[in-house]
Amino acid sequence: MIDAEGYRANVGIVIINDMGQVFWARRYGQHSWQYPQGGVDEGETAEQTMYRELHEEVGLKPEHVKIVASTKHWLKYKLPKRYIRHDSKPVCIGQKQKWFLLKLTAAESSVDLLHSSHPEFDDWRWVSYWYPVRQVVSFKRDVYRMVMKEFANFALPLTYERRPDRRKRRA
């Protein structure tokens, strides 16, 4: 679904584990890494899209995760000119995204990147909370920064709940 301004409706998914690390996936056959994301189909809500994309791209089901938060607003980024397909109608100039923060409640072995007949990702790993902001492709960086700032109050307490006390104790 592309709106009148040329933005495609899309959802983005940040998955966090018990250690406060986030799920980071490599695009199939490429060197670029990103969060799972995907377009909203006609008649779908953002939450329905999120669950569909979560299953298609990561192999996870609703019972494997818990919704912790979602962004208050749709966040936009423009595509670089080289990625805009002017021959398709309507022309898509970028994405507007609703983001979800999910807590993985199932075992990591539930992740199955090859679940789909057309996998989006070929590798994944857990990374520190802010790592993706520095590593994502440049045209998505501002949106990633906004998302991670908005989710920090929800995600970072989860990080510190499970971390062992690293302070040295004095006798």
Swiss-Prot record:
Q: Name one Pfam family in it.
A: NUDIX
Cofactor(s) the record lists: a divalent metal cation
Q: Which domain of life is it from?
A: Bacteria
Question: What broad class of enzyme is this?
Answer: hydrolase
Task: Give this protein's Gene Ontology molecular function annotations.
Answer: mRNA 5'-diphosphatase activity
Keyword list, A-Z: Hydrolase
- Protein EC: 3.6.1.-
Describe the location of the Nudix hydrolase domain by residue ranges. Answer: 6-149
Q: Which PROSITE patterns match?
A: NUDIX, NUDIX_BOX
**Where does motif Nudix box map?**
38-59
The terms describing its cellular component in GO are: cytoplasm
User: Which InterPro entries does UniProt cross-reference here?
Assistant: Nudix_hydrolase (IPR020476), NUDIX_hydrolase-like_dom_sf (IPR015797), NUDIX_hydrolase_CS (IPR020084), NUDIX_hydrolase_dom (IPR000086), RppH (IPR022927)
Role this protein plays: Accelerates the degradation of transcripts by removing pyrophosphate from the 5'-end of triphosphorylated RNA, leading to a more labile monophosphorylated state that can stimulate subsequent ribonuclease cleavage.
Q: Which family does it belong to?
A: Belongs to the Nudix hydrolase family. RppH subfamily.
> Which PANTHER family does the record match to this protein?
M7GPPPN-MRNA HYDROLASE
Q: What is this protein called?
A: RNA pyrophosphohydrolase
**What is the species listed in this Swiss-Prot or TrEMBL entry?**
Colwellia psychrerythraea (strain 34H / ATCC BAA-681)
Gene encoding this chain? rppH
